[in-house]
């Protein structure tokens, strides 16, 4: 079974950190938009999720862990700081990184342009 989605046909998440929520609430600080492209609800996959996140200037993701998921990121454009466990390091266009299951991680945008990342999570046994 084939599952093809296009970002241009998707709506971003609308949680409290999203651009749409903050504009609607007239909040001045915009953090990020996330699009969940492929997931276990819209595809036959039982283990994989793929998404696209834009973190706007001065924005960040909410720090979190995935106890049953490992995650990889690819930085499409921009620059920022990634915190994975106890480590903190700079990321930029072209970087790929891995986050093991159960490890805290968060991302901060640091440049003049939005930080855009593609991410994939996979369920572990």
Roles of regions detected by a PLM:
Residues 43-46, 55-60, 79, 123:
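Short, charged/polar surface micro-motifs in flexible loops or helix N-caps
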Residues 42-43, 68, 112-113:
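Short strand-connecting beta-turns/loops that link adjacent beta-strands
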Residues 1-48, 62:
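A short, N-terminal "cap"/entry segment at the start of jelly-roll beta-barrel domains
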Residues 53-57, 65-82:
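Short, conserved beta-strand element in jelly-roll/cupin
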Residues 62-64, 82-83, 99, 105-112:
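Short beta-strand His + acidic residue motifs that chelate non-heme Fe in jelly-roll/DSBH
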Residues 53, 98, 113-125:
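A short hydrophobic beta-strand segment most commonly corresponding to one strand
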Residues 86-101:
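Short acidic-glycine-tyrosine-enriched beta hairpin
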């Amino acid at each position: 079974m084939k599952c093809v989605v296009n970002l241009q046909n998707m709506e971003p998440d609308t949680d409290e950190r999203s651009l749409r929520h903050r504009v609607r609430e007239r909040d001045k600080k915009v953090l990020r938009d996330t699009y969940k492209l492929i997931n276990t609800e819209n595809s036959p996959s039982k283990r994989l999720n793929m998404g696209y996140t834009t973190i706007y200037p001065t924005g960040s993701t909410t720090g979190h862990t995935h106890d049953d998921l490992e995650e990889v990121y690819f930085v499409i454009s921009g620059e920022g700081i990634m915190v994975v466990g106890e480590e903190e390091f700079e990321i930029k266009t072209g970087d790929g990184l891995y986050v093991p299951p159960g490890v805290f991680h968060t991302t901060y945008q640091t440049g003049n342009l939005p930080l855009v990342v593609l991410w994939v999570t996979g369920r572990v046994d």
